[in-house]
Amino acid sequence: YGEYASQPLVLNFHRTDHKDGSATYFREFLRQYMMAQRPNRSDYPAWNQRQYVIDSIAWVRDPLYGWCNKNFKKDGSPYNVYTDGLKVYTTIDSRMQRYAEEAVYGHVARYLQPEFDKEKQGQPNAPFSDALKPEEVRTILRNSMRQSERYRNMKAAGYTEGEIMKAFRTPTDMTIFSYHGDLDTTMTPMDSIRYYKHFLRAGFMSMDPKTGYVKAYVGGLDYSHFMYDMVTGGRRQVGSTIKPFLYSLAMGNGFTPCDKAPNVQRTYMVAGQPWTPRNGSHARYG
């Protein structure tokens, strides 16, 4: 006993936070959803009033939305997802989640990103389109700066716009993302914003069409560096998912799968003005 008691106690302990482990984007989405406050219109900017309506409906109709602020502990305080010992059961399949994360990361890192970098190589406006003017690029970077955590913290601390801009143009030590692992480097925060604009973003969500159960949820490549959730927050074109709705509407109005339509370019009057849909390839068909 004395021999073992004299040996140092070694613990292989690692505290896991919300940035570690599997399904990080889904876990954070669930935390925000369950801990949402009752929507207040004044908390939403003018351009995002639609989100206020969506959240207000969810607050009334969805018991899970804001659950922690609708249900209270014995002392009357609201629940906290992380500190009150709640057990939250989800429909995520751990194997599908792992496959999804590997597939998204692998496809972007090994295929899409190299193709994008090859296309932008040597272009002075990279990663932006050459069609953008320098002032338009600066506007994009300034808007991204104002959305950053560094900017919000400095603004809350009382710094002026000029002081914040100076800080964003001052080189500082930082850790940045790369596909080969995090890199320690020195650059200005504004340069880091442009650096991150080079990275393609991707999202993936797998759902059982019969039950609506979400089986896999990948909001991005790395939650530590890209916290914007491309599943619920990313805006994208509707794509081919519109087809079932469009075809259902057509058949509801008397069309059948056997009907034929001329494969020609059409022009429609919209608000008194002619409008002609065009393909991205500029081909005049389809």
Task: Give residue ranges: language-model regions.
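Extended, non-catalytic substrate-recognition/exosite surfaces adjacent to catalytic cores, especially
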Residues: 1-273, 278-281
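C-terminal domain-closing interface element
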Residues: 283-286
